[in-house]
């Protein structure tokens, strides 16, 4: 019977545990080993991997694909430590043994660390502890990588615009049209930036319509010639109702980019894309939707912030902006100061769901709840007779 010797601790520790690495940067750390009794160590090895993989079931068929970004192997040595026979290290209890390692990430484009429903981009370092007559022990530690996306390139700083018109009918009878045209100042944004929307809406149909805008994430997975697409609305803003025969305009209506992962556009099996949808809800008909592509970057320079602030200054100011106190005071309640058309919907709201918690139809189409007054307290004495007796 073989008795397995217990290892007290065996772990991978990075020199900078919170760091997010980029292409060409060095990943450094150490493998720490502690034993409970005298133990002979044959070798300590590491394997560093970076891989994108997708997996889902298409009926009875398994759709699976992988793409390697990184693979590095090395056998680690202790500095100034005596070795026993056959170049083995003799470890004793009470001591901490540290094996240092380091490697550089590839210079080419790397997939940003990501975890989705049907795929992920993952990076890790796995350490192996080899002992004679003992099973190999393993430990694993993940680290994050971000492929830098510079949003200050000429292509991403150029304005984006689109327009669309939809004819509306009722029981195959023409009922006018709804049109929308929109423009944003740039295509590339970073977390915390404001997207300033300039849009014009025209409603010549007999119905009351509602304009909205939303930031949408689209995850695309590709494997075995099959494609899987998931779309989710991250945040949104809405405007006022537009009655029949009227027009409306947005001049710098803003929508903030929340904390989201940068776009992943260079991976052949997994893509993370973002869009600004500007759409009009038409009761009893399909929505009129404009699709403006966005690129969410990982690097925001001064020009990005300056452009955003300049656009915001020229935009329409709401009453919220005009009521900022001169002296600091306790912050007011969010629901008290933010108008309904500026409130963000839940991040888990499905894309363009009609039941997103807001009433798209005109307010007079919803009958207010009428409450009757409660009946008076019952009494066997007629108040009229009582009044006549008093007189």
Swiss-Prot record:
Pfam families: Arrestin_C, Arrestin_N
GO CC, one annotated term: cytoplasm
InterPro entries the UniProt entry points to: Arrestin-like_C (IPR014752), Arrestin-like_N (IPR011021), Arrestin_C-like (IPR011022), Arrestin_domain-protein (IPR050357), Ig_E-set (IPR014756)
Molecular function via GO: enzyme inhibitor activity; ubiquitin protein ligase binding
Alphabetical keyword list: Cell cycle, Cytoplasm, Disulfide bond, Isopeptide bond, Phosphoprotein, Transcription, Transcription regulation, Tumor suppressor, Ubl conjugation
Residues with Phosphoserine modification: 361
Cross-link (Glycyl lysine isopeptide (Lys-Gly) (interchain with G-Cter in ubiquitin)): 212
Gene3D superfamilies named in the record: 2.60.40.640
GO biological process: cellular response to tumor cell; keratinocyte differentiation; negative regulation of cell division; negative regulation of transcription by RNA polymerase II; platelet-derived growth factor receptor signaling pathway; protein import into nucleus; protein transport; response to oxidative stress
Main location class: cytoplasm
Localization of this protein: Cytoplasm
Post-translational modification: Ubiquitinated; undergoes heterotypic 'Lys-48'-/'Lys-63'-branched polyubiquitination catalyzed by ITCH and UBR5 resulting in proteasomal degradation. Deubiquitinated by USP5, leading to TXNIP stabilization.
Subunit field text: Homodimer; disulfide-linked. Interacts with TXN/thioredoxin through its redox-active site. Interacts with transcriptional repressors ZBTB16, ZBTB32 and HDAC1. Interacts with DDIT4.
Biological role: May act as an oxidative stress mediator by inhibiting thioredoxin activity or by limiting its bioavailability. Interacts with COPS5 and restores COPS5-induced suppression of CDKN1B stability, blocking the COPS5-mediated translocation of CDKN1B from the nucleus to the cytoplasm. Functions as a transcriptional repressor, possibly by acting as a bridge molecule between transcription factors and corepressor complexes, and over-expression will induce G0/G1 cell cycle arrest. Required for the maturation of natural killer cells. Acts as a suppressor of tumor cell growth.
Sequence similarity: Belongs to the arrestin family.
UniProt protein name: Thioredoxin-interacting protein
Protein species of origin: Sus scrofa
Gene: TXNIP
């Amino acid at each position: 019977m073989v008795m397995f010797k217990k290892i007290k601790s065996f772990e991978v520790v990075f020199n900078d545990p919170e760091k997010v690495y980029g292409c060409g940067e060095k990943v450094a750390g150490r493998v720490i080993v502690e034993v409970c009794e005298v133990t002979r160590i044959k070798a300590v090895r590491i394997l560093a991997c970076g891989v994108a993989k997708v997996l889902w079931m298409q009926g009875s068929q398994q759709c699976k694909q992988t793409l390697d970004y990184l693979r590095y192997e090395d056998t680690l040595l202790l500095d100034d430590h005596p070795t026993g026979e056959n170049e083995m290290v003799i470890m004793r209890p009470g001591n901490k043994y540290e094996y240092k390692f380091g490697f550089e990430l590839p210079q080419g484009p790397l997939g940003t660390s990501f975890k989705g429903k049907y795929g992920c981009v993952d990076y890790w370092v796995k350490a192996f502890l080899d002992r004679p007559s003992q099973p190999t022990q393993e430990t694993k530690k993940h680290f994050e990588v971000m492929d830098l996306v510079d949003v200050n390139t000429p292509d991403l700083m150029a304005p984006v615009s689109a327009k669309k018109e939809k004819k509306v009918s009722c029981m195959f009878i023409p009922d006018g049209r709804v049109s929308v045209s929109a423009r944003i100042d740039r295509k590339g944004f970073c977390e915390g930036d404001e997207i300033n929307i300039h849009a014009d809406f025209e409603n010549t149909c007999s119905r009351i319509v509602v304009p909205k805008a939303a930031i949408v994430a689209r995850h695309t997975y590709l494997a075995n010639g099959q494609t899987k697409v998931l779309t989710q609305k991250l945040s949104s803003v809405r405007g006022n109702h537009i009655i029949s025969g009227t027009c409306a305009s947005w001049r710098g209506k803003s929508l903030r980019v929340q904390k989201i992962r940068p776009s992943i556009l260079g991976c052949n099996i997994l893509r993370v894309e973002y869009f600004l949808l500007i759409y009009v809800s038409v009761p009893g008909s399909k929505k009129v939707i404009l699709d403006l592509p966005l690129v969410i970057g990982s690097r925001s320079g001064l020009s990005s912030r300056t452009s955003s602030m300049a656009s915001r200054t020229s935009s329409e100011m709401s009453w919220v902006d005009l009521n900022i106190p001169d002296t600091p005071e306790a912050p007011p309640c969010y629901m008290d100061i933010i108008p309904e058309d500026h409130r963000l919907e839940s991040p888990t709201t499905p894309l363009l769901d009609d039941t997103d918690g807001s009433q798209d139809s005109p307010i007079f189409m919803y009958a207010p709840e009428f409450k009757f007054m409660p009946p008076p307290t019952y009494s066997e004495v007629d108040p009229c007779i009582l009044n006549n007796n008093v007189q």
